[in-house]
From Swiss-Prot:
Function comment: Polymerase that creates the 3' poly(A) tail of suc22 mRNA.
Origin organism lineage: Eukaryota, Fungi, Dikarya, Ascomycota, Taphrinomycotina
Major localization class: cytoplasm
Identification of the protein by name: Poly(A) RNA polymerase cid13
Organism: Schizosaccharomyces pombe (strain 972 / ATCC 24843)
Cofactor names: Mg(2+); Mn(2+)
Gene: cid13
């Protein structure tokens, strides 16, 4: 019998919770405005040593101790004995997975257990397992057979422990092995993941089922990818390292092989000397302000970011944050959170960064979020107003008014050459290098530049997208208007803005798409009519020829940050003329 086909006749089949949305709809889904990295407080001005000491002290108090581990093993043994007694002919074994096995459990963590039968076809249903547990004196037995992964929840009043049991979902044990291998690669990984999971639990942001947010496993994958992208990297991609791959490494048609000897890669991240406090602060800076949620997918399998367009995820439901499942690569782990929820979580990231940057207080950053009573409607309104204060990075709240180390405006551009590389989450986004002060760069940084009148036919290079292109030859802007866009446009990366400017003429947009395909040599050259002529070299920029204009460009020039491979400079770039 299928595990999930027991709805209706099972008295344990009930909702174990009342769904309470964590991020209210009133926050809205309007995208957050971009924030200049130089407007954020510099890392050298933050007392990361104090933050590290607080983190380690809190980590030692919450991490699962030996006595807690013994209680968990005793509970698992008790459950296995019950199952073998109730189902003597099922050849049942149990396997721990989740945070307990991956060394990421705290004293308050639940137990995750996989019930394995041989053969799998003779497995009992979740309702049968629920009834067996109830007959043997276990409390609070709940059967959730309609979930994506059917589970049985059970509570032991003697050991004061709860457990979630699934049946024959062995892929979960492989995910745990992979996570454990990453944890053992570097001594900073375990405390960093544990503390970020602790923050998420305190802020009620790790409950995908009840609050519509993220799972703890998704958050752990975000941390792993963040550490893989440090400069220099702290973690490798264990699935990309050479390892044994044969028929035994295939499960449900998926390649689940990886390099599983962490001792051989221990010391991989020794060149990176960042402390726990630095990594904790930079995690929230990166996902609060710097990560491009619109275009990229987090992939620990590849140890980098992937393009949403390349994976075909740009039109998926709930795809604001995309985290690739390391084995089942067609699955987005973060699709449990919709766009409004992810906007709220991103603002929560910003809140933590502000509190750490100006107060250096981990307890304040991890303060407990408590849901209000159902009759208290003003609480969530106040919470939304508090989140909206994080949209503008002025940080006027929660810091000393005499602190002038960070302002809403970036530093004087004549002293810095700014170039932001979204492929590398570097600790400091600016370079101490004098540049040519004879050129007026104020139009790049100033918020007071008047909008260009609609009748002026010039477009300007979007610095963020151009930096992506220059830094990676394989990167292709998702659309024509992502690469060349109106400066100060309210829709800087929107294809709808392109349609509005040209009267909704889809034919012209299709012509620009054909130029994108021609650059990859997927289509033969063909002639097209319209205001834009078809040229195979329309996007002929290369990292070694940054100033070469496209073949159909005008002579108009604008200043844009370019060439992140070499010494960063600000140089002129040819712009298209519409």
């Amino acid at each position: 019998m299928d595990n999930a086909n027991c709805v209706g006749g099972c008295k344990f089949e009930t909702r174990s919770f009342q769904y309470r949305r964590r991020i209210p709809y009133s926050l809205g889904a309007d995208p957050l405005p971009p924030v200049h990295p130089l407007s954020l407080k510099n890392l050298v001005d933050i007392d990361t040593d104090l933050i590290s000491s607080q983190l380690y002290e809190l980590y030692d108090s919450i991490i699962l101790n030996d006595s807690g581990l013994e209680r968990r093993y005793a509970f698992v043994q008790k459950l296995e004995q019950i199952l073998k007694k109730e189902f003597p002919y099922k050849n049942i074994k149990t396997s721990l997975f989740g945070s307990t096995q991956s060394l990421l459990a705290s004293n308050a963590s639940d137990i995750d257990l996989c019930i394995i039968t041989d053969p799998p076809q003779c497995a009992p249903t979740t309702c049968e397992v629920s009834a067996a547990f109830a007959r043997n004196g276990l409390k609070k037995v709940v059967c959730i057979s309609t979930a994506k992964v059917p589970i049985v929840k059970v509570w032991d009043s003697e050991l004061q422990l709860s457990c979630d049991c699934n049946i024959n979902k062995t892929i979960s044990t492989l995910n745990t092995r992979l996570m454990r291998s990453y944890v053992l690669c570097d001594p900073r990984v375990r405390p960093l993941i544990v503390m970020i999971k602790y923050w998420a639990k305190r802020r009620c942001l790790n409950d995908a089922a009840e609050g519509g947010t993220l799972t703890s496993y998704t958050i752990s994958c975000m941390v792993i990818n963040f550490l893989q992208k440090r400069d220099p990297p702290i973690l490798p991609s264990l699935q990309m390292l050479p390892h044994l791959q044969d028929s035994s490494t295939m499960t449900d048609g998926l390649d689940v092989s990886f390099f599983d000897d962490p001792d051989l890669v221990h010391g991989f991240g020794d060149k990176n000397e960042e402390s726990l406090g630095i990594l904790f602060v930079e995690f929230f800076r990166f996902f609060g302000y710097l990560f491009d949620y619109e275009h990229f997918v987090l992939s620990i399998r590849h140890g980098t970011f992937l393009s949403k367009r390349a994976k075909g995820w740009q039109f998926q439901l709930n795809n604001f944050l995309c985290v690739e499942e390391p084995f089942h690569t067609s699955r987005n782990l973060a699709n449990t959170a919709d766009e409004i929820t992810m906007k709220g979580i991103q603002l929560e990231f910003r809140r933590v960064f502000r509190l750490l940057a100006y107060n250096c207080n981990v307890d304040d950053a991890c303060s407990q979020f408590t849901f209000p009573s159902l009759t208290d409607t003003s609480f969530m309104d106040d919470y939304v107003n508090e989140l909206q204060l994080e949209i503008v990075p002025g940080f006027s709240h929660g810091r000393d008014s005499s602190d002038t180390s960070c302002t809403e405006s970036p530093p004087e551009p004549s002293h810095f050459a700014w170039a932001f590389d979204p492929y590398n989450a570097t600790a400091s986004p600016y370079y101490n290098q004098n540049i040519n002060s004879s050129i007026d760069y104020s139009s790049i940084y100033s918020n007071d530049v008047p909008a260009i009148p609609p009748n002026v036919p010039y477009t300007f290079v979007d610095p963020y997208t151009y930096a992506c292109y220059i830094n990676n030859n394989s990167y292709l802007p998702p659309s024509y208007m992502d690469f060349y866009t109106w400066y100060n446009s309210p829709y800087p990366k929107s294809s709808h803005h392109f349609d509005e400017r040209h009267g909704g003429d889809r034919h012209e947009k299709n012509l620009s798409n054909s130029r994108r395909y021609s650059r990859n040599k997927f289509h033969k050259k063909k002639q097209s009519s319209g205001p834009f002529q078809y040229y195979p070299d329309a996007f002929s920029f290369t990292p070694t020829d940054n100033n070469s204009p496209p073949s159909n460009s005008s002579s108009s020039e604008v200043v844009s940050p370019v060439s992140l491979h070499s010494e960063p400079v600000l140089s002129t770039v040819q712009a298209f003329k519409s």
